[in-house]
Amino acid sequence: MGKAWTDAPRVYLTGRITLERDRTAVDERRLPGRQGRRAFAYLVMERARPVPIDEVALAVWGTAEPSGAWETALSAIVSKLRATLKPLGFDARAIAAESGCYRLTLPAGAWVDVEAARRALDEAEGHVRARRPSQAWGPANVAASIAERPFLAGDDGEWIARVRAGLRDTRVRALECLAAVASANGEHPLAARLARDVVDLEPFRETGWQRLMRALADGGNRAEALRAYAECRALMAKELGVAPSPETEGIASTLRGARAGSSA
């Protein structure tokens, strides 16, 4: 009789790939090498559908036409993955072969970090829009923390780049949520630091510059806020040949008026 598992598995695809269930953990050192790591990550990400074997091969080897007997090699990788998952209560059906496809199935309630980050971001942004900052910090912090970790470090490929781009977007938006919460709580230096993180990651994202300018001004640093505006304007002109948006210009105009009023 098999072990009775009390918890659904947790799958970490960022950082070091790790699977946890109850008190049992399997990390990527148990996966069948670099190719096994790529195959597992791809099958987890695409588990909502059967994935054609040639698509899995492309994800594993990064080429549409792997050399040699690639179908045999891929079958061996999948067999080793099944063996790796067995200590966590997965049977051979966890990665099923059907009609020229592979499909990975996780038990009900399984938690996958990349997906959890997206859900947490949606929750945080909803709280920010509804002006519930106290409820936004937790999920925004979860999203930012997960999205900051590397995905398949040392590997590359179109699908890997897409996942990384999604994580980067999640992190940037989560940092914006955290900055909004900090501003709402009157923690203006923290809000400015978080907004600076946003513009460092995405320098053409004007909402980040706007948050930075407002946070600096609200913290009593109007000159620094105008300096941030000048930095934004110079970047836009040099790299894109455009001026900042009317909203950004409006914030700068308000800051100039406030500075003029204070010196009158």
Regions found by a protein language model. Give the residues of each.
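Short boundary/linker motifs that mark transitions into or out of structured domains
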Residues: 1-37, 92-103
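Conserved RecA-like P-loop NTPase ATPase core
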Residues: 19, 40, 56, 81, ...
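Intrinsically disordered, charged and Pro/Gly-enriched terminal/linker segments
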Residues: 26-30, 34, 42-48, 65-72, ...
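Active-site phosphate/pyrophosphate-handling residues
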Residues: 38, 55, 173
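Short coil-to-helix segment of the ABC ATPase nucleotide-binding domain corresponding to the Q-loop/switch region
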Residues: 48-60
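Non-catalytic DNA-binding core/recognition domains of DNA-processing enzymes
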Residues: 74-82
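Glycine-centered, phosphate/nucleic-acid-interacting loop/turn motifs that mediate DNA/RNA or nucleotide
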Residues: 85
